[in-house]
Amino acid sequence: AIAAARLGAARVAAIELDHDAIGNAEENVARNHAQDAVHVIEGDAGTLLPLLAPVRVILANIISSVLLDLSAGMLAALTPDGEAILSGMLATEREPLRHELECGGWRIGAERVEGDWWSCVLSPR
């Protein structure tokens, strides 16, 4: 969220499910002077994304099981020209995830495997 603000995003919603992480997230936003753009919201992304839609970009560091649970909601929340930039998925899960995402209506763009981790850029088909 902070990186998005530094790169010029005027409005960033940082969704955090873990109540204990909210204070740290807000401190990091303040420490990086990003509070005008970044708003930390406590809650479930599956519930909040439809309320925030339409969005141009979704950034998420997310494990594969949560990604699959949120996939349809993320797709519905994006503008037709939007992108989801994802990291935090195990490289060993790359192929089955690719298959599930493509079957779920996503086009997979840039990808990167670094050590044990896979990241990718998705867009609606």
Where are these regions (language model features)?
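Core SAM-dependent methyltransferase catalytic element
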Residues: 106-125
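Short alpha-helix immediately C-terminal to the canonical SAM-binding loop
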Residues: 22-23, 67, 94
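ADP-ribose/adenylate-binding Rossmann-like module
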Residues: 81-94
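Conserved SAM/SAH cofactor-binding pocket of Class I
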Residues: 1-46
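A short acidic, Gly/Pro-enriched loop at the edge of an enzyme's catalytic core
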Residues: 46-57
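Residue-level signal for inorganic ion chemistry
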Residues: 25, 63, 101
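A short glycine-rich, Lys/Arg-flanked "PGG" loop and its adjoining helix->strand segment in the class I
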Residues: 68-83
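A short SAM/SAH-binding and catalytic strip from SAM-dependent methyltransferases
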Residues: 56-69, 88
